[in-house]
Amino acid sequence: MIVVFAMMTVMNVKAQDNNVQPYYELDQMPKLIEIMPAPPAFDSPEFANDIVRYGWGKQQREDEERLELAIADAEWDDLTKVFLQWKDAFGLEISEMGTPEIYKLMVTALATTDPMRKETKAYYHRERPFERFNDTMPSHEEDDLRGEGSYPSGHSLRGWGISLLLAQIAPQRASEIFSRGWDYCNSRVIVGAHWQSDVDASRTAASIGFCALQGNEAFITQMKKAQAEYAEKTGTTDVREVRAQARQQSARIFHIDGTPADENSHGVVIENGKKKVQ
């Protein structure tokens, strides 16, 4: 158990550049161990589906392009490379120098949500697919992952979390962003790092962490900066401005005859509590 925690601590430190201060400490975040069910038992229909999906993943490796993508999705340490996997979907490359506000938001948010997996992983210590089948991984992660719990998937929790954050920054590209995030999570099945149920649980876990962030004032402030930076960098209209204009239009005052108060009206209006004909 100590070894497992030590391995996860190393991975967590690598993922958090320069010891980023998270929006919330881990003990302030929802406890997945109290929320998520146990992973499927070996004799359950859910685990039977895991076996089927493991076979599906191995079939996907026959597609060289998909396999190459799955291997690239395995990156963990370099967040700039991780973010690069969403470049086309997001419509913008994320980097510390090129998009400092977006980068700060993403790194700090992940420093907050990534550690959520640790307690549940250690508690269930689920055997990984490549371990159970004594298989090799095309992403060559065996030495790093062997002995570390499979449930939930850290990559999938992070990947779906990234998708949620990017879709909040650029909701007009949500379809592309979530499509990329879905495939990113499934890459963990393809390389044999995780069972499908690990991945599915992690999407839910990421959503839980994402919701928790919405109540943090520092996160809200940084999200607004990230949204403004995205609008500036891409030349797109800030959707918040569009919505504000729509609210302003819907809040206009009208005369009794139905004409806007800021336009000339004709007919009967109410003035000082009395009817008046214009």
Regions found by a protein language model. Give the residues of each.
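Residue-level detector of functionally pivotal "anchor" positions at catalytic/ligand-binding pockets or at interdomain
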Residues: 235-257
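Short acidic/histidine-rich active-site segments
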Residues: 192-201
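Acidic surface patches and DE-rich sequence motifs
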Residues: 255, 264, 270-271
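C-terminal tail/sorting-segment detector
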Residues: 268-278
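Bacterial Sec-dependent N-terminal signal peptides
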Residues: 1-16
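Hydrophobic alpha-helical bundle signature of multipass membrane enzymes
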Residues: 16-191, 204, 212-222, 228-232
